[in-house]
Each structure stands twice: as structure tokens, then as C-alpha cells.
């Protein structure tokens, strides 16, 4: 029961914004009950949120050793790999997350970004299309999908992305048009203030 007291204290400290103190309390709970993987998951999540990705990794791996079907933990592990530039490992983790939970849009998004970082733009487009389909109002997924199509020199698909994105986020649409150097589409966003 004592491990729960440390867990609840840590949870409160985390909610109040005391990240390091909450980690210390979660670690105390783990010393009492090492198989209390909720604590490992929270520690990993906090460390990743602090940008301490290498420190977060072993905690995510501990969670996954106990619960290999945890799609969110696979996603979070992929995120830590992606942030460290370890894109092949990120792809493996994101792929497992999407296999376990095919509607986990953020895993598809991360998968697309990791493929793009490796220059695998066709695979990136496939993953980003899934992310955009699952979250049709996510301008970042649509922007990245448009850039993947631009890199693949698929003007028709990129134009379709621009037209879709224009309906709900003209500013991101303008950014996509500029970044893709598609001045032929400037007329769509000419009324936006610079």
C-alpha cells in the first residue's frame, strides 16, 4: 500500500508542475514495488516532456517489457527516438504502435515524419495520409503530407492537399505554398495579411 502513497504524491507533484520532485516520488514507489509499471510510464513521460529522451528510453522499455501491447508506450518510445535522430528505431516503434492501434493518428504522423527524415517520401506520404484521414482537421498532418507530395513531384496530389487545407487553415496553406515554392497557387491566399 505504501507504493500507492508515493504514486499519489508523485501524481500531485506532477500536476502542480514539480517534475523532478514527482520523478523522485515515482522512483520511491518503484523501489517499494518494482513491478508497479505505472510509475515507470509516468517517469518516462515526464523525462520525455523535459527533453531528456535518453533517460526516458529505459523506462519506456521497462513498460513495454511488461506490456508489449501498449500502443501508447510504443508511440512514446518512437517519439524519444525521433527526437534523438534515431529514425530507423523510431519507425520500428511507431510501426508497432500503428499495428497495435491502427487509429492512433499521432503514431502515423510520427511514422511519416521519420520516413521523411530518411528521405523515404513515398512511405512518408502513405503514413501521413493515414494521419490526415484519422484527423482531417489537423493542419500539421496535411502540411507534411503536402510537402511529401511536393518532394515526390506529385503536383495533382499536392494541389488536392492545398485545396483541402485552405478550407480550414489558410495560414498553414500559405506556408505550404511558400515552402513548396508554388507561386502558381499564391492567388488562393493573396488576401491574407503577411
Residue ranges and their predicted role:
Residues 1-28, 38, 42-49:
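Alpha-helical segment of the N-proximal tetratricopeptide repeat
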Residues 3-4, 37-38, 71-72, 105-106, ...:
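Helix-start (N-cap) detector for alpha-helical repeat units in TPR-like alpha-solenoids
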Residues 15-28, 49-62, 69, 83-96, ...:
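Structural signature of tandem alpha-helical TPR/SEL1-like repeats
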Residues 32, 66, 100, 134, ...:
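Structural marker of alpha-solenoid helical repeat scaffolds
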Residues 102-126:
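A contiguous binding-surface segment within folded domains or other stable secondary-structure elements
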Residues 146-153, 172-193:
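TPR/TPR-like alpha-solenoid helical repeat scaffolds
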Amino acid at each position: 500500500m505504501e507504493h500507492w502513497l508515493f504514486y499519489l504524491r508523485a501524481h500531485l507533484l506532477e500536476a502542480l508542475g514539480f517534475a523532478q520532485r514527482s520523478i523522485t516520488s515515482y522512483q520511491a514507489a518503484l523501489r517499494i514495488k518494482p513491478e508497479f509499471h505505472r510509475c515507470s510510464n509516468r517517469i518516462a513521460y515526464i523525462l520525455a516532456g523535459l527533453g531528456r529522451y535518453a533517460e526516458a528510453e529505459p523506462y519506456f522499455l521497462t513498460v513495454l517489457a511488461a506490456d508489449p501491447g501498449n500502443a501508447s508506450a510504443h508511440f512514446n518510445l518512437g517519439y524519444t527516438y525521433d527526437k534523438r535522430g534515431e529514425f530507423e528505431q523510431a519507425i520500428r516503434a511507431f510501426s508497432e504502435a500503428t499495428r497495435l492501434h491502427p487509429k492512433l493518428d499521432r503514431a502515423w504522423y510520427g511514422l511519416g515524419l521519420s520516413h521523411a527524415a530518411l528521405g523515404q517520401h513515398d512511405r512518408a506520404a502513405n503514413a501521413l495520409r493515414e494521419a490526415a484521414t484519422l484527423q482531417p482537421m489537423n493542419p500539421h498532418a496535411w502540411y507534411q503530407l503536402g510537402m511529401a507530395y511536393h518532394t515526390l513531384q506529385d503536383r495533382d496530389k499536392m494541389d488536392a492537399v492545398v485545396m483541402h487545407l485552405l478550407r480550414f487553415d489558410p495560414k498553414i496553406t500559405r506556408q505550404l505554398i511558400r515552402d513548396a515554392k508554388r507561386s502558381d497557387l499564391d492567388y488562393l491566399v493573396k488576401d491574407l495579411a503577411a
